Curated annotation (Swiss-Prot):
It catalyses: 5-amino-1-(5-phospho-beta-D-ribosyl)imidazole + S-adenosyl-L-methionine = 4-amino-2-methyl-5-(phosphooxymethyl)pyrimidine + CO + 5'-deoxyadenosine + formate + L-methionine + 3 H(+). It comes from Bacillus anthracis. Pfam families: ThiC-associated (PF13667), ThiC_Rad_SAM (PF01964). Catalyzes the synthesis of the hydroxymethylpyrimidine phosphate (HMP-P) moiety of thiamine from aminoimidazole ribotide (AIR) in a radical S-adenosyl-L-methionine (SAM)-dependent reaction. Belongs to the ThiC family. InterPro entries: ThiC, ThiC-associated_dom, ThiC/Bza_core_dom, ThiC/BzaA/B. The keyword 4Fe-4S applies. Its cofactor is [4Fe-4S] cluster. Substrate binds at N193, M222, Y251, H287, S307, R308, G309, D348, G349, L350, R351, E387, Y414. [4Fe-4S] cluster binds at C535, C538, C543. The keyword 4Fe-4S applies. This is Phosphomethylpyrimidine synthase. The lineage of its organism: Bacteria, Bacillati, Bacillota, Bacilli, Bacillales. Keywords: 4Fe-4S, Iron, Iron-sulfur, Lyase, Metal-binding, S-adenosyl-L-methionine, Thiamine biosynthesis, Zinc. NCBIfam families: PRK09284.1, PRK13352.1, thiC.
Length: 586
């Protein structure tokens, strides 16, 4: 009997403390855009309004939704896609055991019950990409949905997509995804990498990581599985993912040739692209910029080629002494992408893997090629974002952003960090968040998270949480620095709650309410401490905010301005000091 993955096998949590799922009605019937509404308590009887924030958690935090992983989550986009009249259902390619990296299918593999569904593709001669619609002046439902999430006009969304400054990754075979946008004129987004390896993890664990990451705020997921059951794992993830899903197709193609890079062929890779597009992958990382002539340049590096995809293609190029087949077949790849609206994430296969290699000739040579490929993809109206480094010290970060905008004509930048130092294994979520905040401020559209396990091992769900929260901090800091019109509202609300000692509101308004409450309660667990006008850091007598309240109250009682109150209060304290003998505390 075939196994299954059920909600009982993974940890699913309701909405974050003090929050509830709300929906904003869109311009078309049935369109409901999710938000998370954070309640606030009153201040001396005066109401504090609830704060609405961007929500990526999908239906899992809706108390009215019953989680049934084997059925997948709702498909809000399905009717939008069909009513356009430019797609057709077809039989699709046959799923083979080799897709899961085995010769014979295992009866113990939990097959998704609806794997026999018919995929969609563009009708003959049609182009179904969001960029194609946008360039033809058409505002699609996905663009209207995104406009509500971002608090902007739908026409602005259309224009940003049409001009290539933003992408809306939305494969027509992933109708479960809630539309989102990646571009420097919108909220900075965060991607979370998940996926098994040859030595670790199960399908249930990877589905759990996906739900866990989106609960904490991941805007997209990349399934980087390199072990067994790659196809089946991806099917379970996509059918239950409320956010876009990306992959690196060369990983699965390599499994199909038993892990031998030189045995890769264009035909195997092409088959893998179609397989994943039919499943609903929203964006592909494709290392088409790793050219044969660039590989020798990496020989003088400290850490050589550190990208898995980049090293696979470099090995193939050197063995055959031929140009990268991803580059030579790029136009054919574009033809596949536009049939399903899969977006390009042009991979940085020659990114620096150490501070010593940052901004070197190999890295920027590849970037020049990615700029060339961007123009080709745009000729086909295929959406493109550009992947970036890597390991870069702080003083070299801005150059990366400036070069990408210039060379790649403003296409969205998607960076891994960058890590700003190499000396902190176990803390690389911090070393990279420093760089991520900076490059986000300079214009990067999406940040790929780094977990504490980077360079050390496969992250578990707790590492995923740590990585997502760390990168949400970096992304939000970048939004503030860029002057995003709504970014400061949550900061202002939390600051007000902090000054008014509304402890629960402080917890609830934070990115990780559970962690904030846990740390507070380690020293002040009593319920009364939730209304106390101090915490354990300073205690009741030395709380700066309590002293500020006292000064304001003194000013009010004595009809003084705050500065006058401080001056008068200081004089009174000086007089009191002298009258008591001028003795210091011992």
């Amino acid at each position: 009997m075939k196994q299954s993955v059920s909600a009982e096998q993974i940890e699913l949590k309701s909405s974050l403390p003090g929050s509830k799922k709300v929906y904003v009605d869109g311009p078309r019937e049935g369109m409901k855009v999710p938000m998370r509404e954070i309640e606030q308590s009153d201040t001396n009887g005066v109401p504090n309004p609830p704060i609405r924030v961007y929500d990526t958690s999908g239906p899992y935090t809706d108390p009215a939704y019953k989680v049934e992983l084997e059925k997948g989550i709702p498909t809000p986009r399905h009717s939008w896609i069909l009513e356009r009249g430019d797609v057709e259902a077809y039989e699709g390619r046959e799923v083979k055991p080799e897709d899961d990296g085995v010769k014979v299918a295992s009866k113990h593999t939990p097959v998704f019950p609806q794997m026999d569904r018919k995929p969609l593709r563009a009708k003959q001669g049609a182009n179904v990409t969001q960029m194609h619609y946008a360039r033809n002046g058409i505002i699609k439902s996905e663009m209207e949905y995104v406009a509500i999430r971002e608090g902007v006009d739908p026409e602005f969304v259309r224009k940003e997509i049409a001009e290539g400054r933003a992408i809306l990754p939305a494969n027509i075979n992933h109708p479960e995804a809630e539309p989102m946008i990646i571009g420097r004129n919108f909220h900075v987004k965060v991607n979370a990498n998940i996926g098994n390896s040859a030595v670790s993890s199960s399908i249930a664990e990877e589905v759990e990581k996906m739900t866990w990451a989106t609960r904490w705020g991941a805007d997209t997921i990349m399934d980087l599985s390199t072990g067994k059951n790659i196809h089946t794992t991806r099917e379970w993830i996509i059918r239950n993912a409320p956010v876009p899903v990306g992959t690196v197709p060369i990983y699965q193609a390599l499994e199909k040739v038993n892990g031998i890079a030189e045995d890769l062929t264009w035909e195997v890779y092409r088959d893998t692209l179609i397989e994943q597009a039919e499943q609903g992958v929203d964006y592909f990382t494709i290392h088409a910029g790793v050219l044969l002539r660039y590989i020798p340049i990496t020989a003088k590096r400290t850490t050589g080629i550190v990208s898995r995809g980049g090293s696979i293609m470099a090995q193939w190029c050197l063995f055959h002494h031929k140009e990268n087949f991803l580059y030579t077949h790029f136009e054919e790849i574009c033809e596949i992408m536009k049939q399903y609206d899969v977006s390009f994430s042009l991979g940085d296969g020659l990114r620096p893997g150490s501070i010593a290699d940052a901004n070197d000739e190999a890295q920027f040579s590849e970037l020049e090629t990615l700029g060339e490929l961007t123009k080709i993809a745009w000729k086909h109206d295929v959406q493109v974002m550009i992947e970036g480094p890597g390991h870069v010290p702080m003083h070299l970060i801005k150059e990366n952003m400036e070069k990408e905008l210039d060379i790649c004509q403003g296409a969205p930048f998607y960076t891994l960090g960058p890590l700003t130092t190499d000396i902190a294994p176990g803390y690389d979520h911090i070393t990279s968040a420093i760089g991520a905040a900076m490059i986000g401020w300079f214009g990067t559209a999406m940040l790929c998270y780094v977990t504490p396990k980077e360079h050390l091992g496969l992250p578990n769900k707790d590492d995923v949480r740590e990585g997502v929260i760390t990168y949400k901090i970096a992304a939000h800091a970048a939004d503030l620095a860029k002057g995003h019109k709504t970014a400061h509202q949550r900061d202002d609300a939390l600051s007000k709650a902090r000054f008014e000692f509304r402890w629960r509101d402080q917890f609830n308004l934070s990115l990780d309410p559970e962690r904030a409450m846990e740390y507070h309660d380690e020293t002040l667990p009593a319920e009364g401490a939730k209304t106390a006008h101090f915490c354990s850091m300073c205690g009741p007598k030395f709380c700066s905010m309590r002293i500020s309240h006292d000064i304001r109250e003194y000013a009010k009682e004595n009809d003084l301005e705050t500065t006058e109150a401080i001056e008068k209060g200081m004089k009174e304290k000086a007089k009191e000091f002298k009258e008591t003998g001028s003795h210091l505390y011992q």
